[in-house]
Amino acid sequence: MKASRFFIGTLKEAPADAEIVSHKLMVRAGMIRRVAGGIYNYLPVGLRSIRKVEAIVREEMNRAGAIELLMPAVQPAELWQESGRWEQYGPELLRFKDRKDNDFVIGPTHEEVVTDIARNQIKSYRQMPVNFYQIQTKFRDEIRPRFGVMRGREFIMKDAYSFDKDAAGLNESYRKMYDAYVRIFTRLGLEFRAVAADSGSIGGNFSHEFHVIADTGEDAIAYCPTSEFAANVEAAEALPLIAERAAPAEAMEKVATPGKAKCEAVAELLSIPLERTIKSIVLATDNEGAEPTIWLVMLRGDHDLNEIKASKLPGLKNHRFATEQEIVEWFGTPPGYLGPVGTKKPVKVIADRTVANMSDFVVGANEVDYHIAGVNWGRDLPEPEVADVRNVKKGDPSPDGKGVIDICRGIEVGHVFQLGTKYSEAMGATFLDESGKPQPMLMGCYGVGITRILGAAIEQNFDDKGIIWPESIAPFEVVLCPMGYDRSDMVRETADKLYAELVAAGIDVILDDRGERPGVMFADWELIGVPHRLVIGERGLKEGKIEYQGRRDAEATLLPADTAAAAVAEKIRAALAH
């Protein structure tokens, strides 16, 4: 590629609405341009990287035995009504009517459509396992699109769907996709972790998220540095921090805590560790035609409620936070002084695992400006219902018993689910088993955010000059920067020769023949993030040398002109192999 025949749309300044590094750099590097909120044009530089991501994903999906197809972006409402998601999905599902007043959606995902394909095409167990995938543009009507391609409304995604006759087959399909994702993100040159996760709105029982590690990541990941354990904080098991409950050592006592409604303030006033205080959170579940059920969830003062875990407890699936009016009615006091001792009306108490093993702890007295110290289970309170209802913290024991938890930030770029029969039962996708009886197909679904990967890669790979692409997804692998291409025969002939040698070696190279000043050339390609640069100048050529600099290198080095192309090609091959 010659730069004079390519479109390079770099900018010196980022738009005012760009909040994070990847959004700023993608605009400045000429990769994207905004059309509407969360909707972008992908300019030539950006599209080249997209196509490289797609190629790696496609190769690994094919290698894993998945079969490519293409489903429509526009889907009839009837399919979503069959699955039940027409009512469940919410305003993120873009709905519209055609001229005949029929309801349609723009697909944010394709479980319904692919299940419709399967129920019409798969009739026997002999036709399974099968795994269909596509790479396609999708639309999710985010309430607040931001961060460029990281939280856009329109995006490119690879989604795959497996169909199996039994649980063993589903497990095998899932394993193949999990392994394929590990290969994909390794080939993309990204630091990533696969974490156990909650299945969210897709549904299903078992899932993993793939996160690119970045300080700007939206998701908190709990992992163990000395083992393979990793999980989304929302899904990570929180073990009790006290192995065995100690015998009571204090008498229960009501203490004045004027104006101290927070655990931290109470601990400071009473000169006790925060870990001896209890945080009381009030949840409610509604009962048709009757007053709500009120739940008191007890956490250690330094711990936080995990709502996803709470929602999975019996009776709490559709919980909400209690209103202040309800709290006063049941406890006799506003929030800040709540506790399980002496409530006005009966409540259901759930203690986190750590709280269940505590002794001599401090709770609210259900009276403004008062708490109760020296509280103990069995003596002052009945034994509680015990459950894991908190988020893990740094320093907690790892659930696998092989170390302690650390926390990092991650950007979700892939997700794999075991759906089971959620969609096949709802939509009647059955097959005849070995005995001729109809059975629901077992499904898995597997997504990769193609455009989101670009943003995540940049969040992990940048400096004050611009993007630093891994070789595998850089728009170009090498840029040739000739000094005086239009003025010096020696420079032009050498640059053209290097270009031809690199092309012949299968290297993705661009020759900057625009005639720009060196400073402009260097700034453009550093901003765009090309991993390797060769500078051809008369002074160096007279000594038989060409200047080489990797995008991550602090200093340039000199290479023999006659072997420079081969040397750079070898660097690229080594990087891709690694």
UniProtKB/Swiss-Prot annotation:
What GO terms are given for molecular function?
Answer: aminoacyl-tRNA deacylase activity; ATP binding; proline-tRNA ligase activity
Keywords attached to this Swiss-Prot or TrEMBL record, sorted alphabetically, are: Aminoacyl-tRNA synthetase, ATP-binding, Cytoplasm, Ligase, Nucleotide-binding, Protein biosynthesis
Cellular component aspect of the GO annotation: cytosol
- Pfam families from the UniProt entry: HGTP_anticodon, tRNA-synt_2b, tRNA_edit
Q: What is its main location?
A: cytoplasm
Q: Which InterPro entries match?
A: aa-tRNA-synt_IIb (IPR002314), aa-tRNA-synth_II (IPR006195), aa-tRNA-synth_II/BPL/LPL (IPR045864), Anticodon-bd (IPR004154), Anticodon-bd_dom_sf (IPR036621), Pro-tRNA-ligase_IIa (IPR002316), Pro-tRNA-synth_IIa_bac-type (IPR004500), Pro-tRNA-Synthase_IIa_type1 (IPR023717)
The biological process GO terms on file are:
prolyl-tRNA aminoacylation
Q: Which reaction does it catalyse?
A: tRNA(Pro) + L-proline + ATP = L-prolyl-tRNA(Pro) + AMP + diphosphate
The lineage's top-level taxon is Bacteria
Q: What is its EC number?
A: 6.1.1.15
In terms of PROSITE patterns, this protein maps to:
AA_TRNA_LIGASE_II
Enumerate the SUPFAM superfamilies for this protein: Class II aaRS ABD-related (SSF52954), Class II aaRS and biotin synthetases (SSF55681), YbaK/ProRS associated domain (SSF55826)
Query: Quaternary arrangement and interactors, per the entry?
Result: Homodimer.
Note on domains (UniProt): Consists of three domains: the N-terminal catalytic domain, the editing domain and the C-terminal anticodon-binding domain.
Q: Which family does it belong to?
A: Belongs to the class-II aminoacyl-tRNA synthetase family. ProS type 1 subfamily.
Q: Say what the protein does.
A: Catalyzes the attachment of proline to tRNA(Pro) in a two-step reaction: proline is first activated by ATP to form Pro-AMP and then transferred to the acceptor end of tRNA(Pro). As ProRS can inadvertently accommodate and process non-cognate amino acids such as alanine and cysteine, to avoid such errors it has two additional distinct editing activities against alanine. One activity is designated as 'pretransfer' editing and involves the tRNA(Pro)-independent hydrolysis of activated Ala-AMP.
Protein name (record): Proline--tRNA ligase
Which organism is this entry from? Answer: Burkholderia orbicola (strain AU 1054)
